[in-house]
Amino acid sequence: MSDIEKEENKDSSPPTTPPTGGPTKNNDIDDDEKENKIERSLTENLNKRFYNNNNNNSNNSNGEEIEDIDYKNFKTIKEFGYYYNDKGELRSIEGEEKFKFINQQQYDRLGDIIVKTIQNKMKSEPINLEEHWIPKGETNQCNIFTSKDFFENPTKLMVFINGSGAVKSGQWARSLCINDTLNTGSILPYLNDAISNDFSIIVLNPNYNVFEERIIEEGEEQKEKAKEEEEKKDDNGKLLKKKRVDNSIKGSENSNNHILTVYDEFIKKSPAKEIVIVAHSFGGVNTTYLLDNRGEEIADRLKSIAFTDSVHSLSPKSSSFTKSFFADENKTKNWVKSDKKLNTDLGFSKLQGCNIASSGHRVHEFTSSACRVPLFQFILNSLKK
């Protein structure tokens, strides 16, 4: 039995999605609390699966003391002693060993650099996506990616929305990019399939909500400017009171705002007659929010939505368009974690308002890679109707 089936058997009301209309302050708080709760749950489960050691442990698995290293200024995977082989596996330069967790700073910094590695692959042959920093003209920005034909392709567009947490544009699961392969943890295989099927592409970045240092050379100017602002002195040489620096990104203050901003500034301007959405985990909540707030605009062009272990739910506040679109088995499907055979029909979920099927994998992070083949077939079939 999938988690969604178990949840529907509970005697409890489903969480509500935000009401239609633009985002409000109270809605933003509710969304953030919900997103943080899901993120904490996913992170706790992840740590239990991959790590048995304490994050603050100064010894390795052999009981040997580990040198106290400050990883925050590392800028390449090589500095950590690792590289990606031809199979997309992270391996140590010496010994070809799998990643060894030392502490959270090491893991987080390596994860940040791996994001840049994946995004560089997205911008290189054979994928060749273009990077856009939004909003234009602002110091605090986040990046999204589009295919070079995004504003010219008149036929079909594929939209990618990842889940919540530490993942950024180009990733399904950071843990898999580190502990398994880029083929399971990143969206690179999906991008290749989209290109081979002549889709234009846009890859969103819903978790990039505050300005971050751009790894390598980028971001140094903004970093120094912020430092100078904090260290200003008066005429007597006394340090002035530091101003609180707001690093939030306008239009992307939270994941739902990001979705609407990218829709208004990019997706709406695409000439594609047919639009499909692929969304993982909390990306399903963002997709629901998009339909609740831009349903009338996108209705004529939206052909299908493919979820991978989405955590969304519908409520009386969900729009009629969202409910009807999700209820159509030819337009919406959620491939959930399950021990059933890949693509096994698991029926209709009242909680989520859509049909669900087995992803062929029992672990949440693996669902996107596990169901890629039937998911693409579902999308292609939706364009024929």
From Swiss-Prot:
| Superkingdom of source | Eukaryota
**Where are the stretches annotated Disordered?**
1-65, 220-239
What is one cellular component GO term in this UniProt entry? nucleus
List the biased-composition ranges (Basic and acidic residues): 220-238
Give the matching Pfam families. Arb2 (PF22749)
Residue ranges annotated as compositionally biased, kind Low complexity, are: 52-62
**GO biological process, alphabetically ordered:** regulatory ncRNA-mediated heterochromatin formation
InterPro entries, per database record: AB_hydrolase_fold, Arb2, Arb2_dom
Q: List the disulfide bonds.
A: none
Per the record, the similarity remark reads: Belongs to the ARB2A family.
Name of the protein this chain belongs to: Cotranscriptional regulator ARB2A homolog
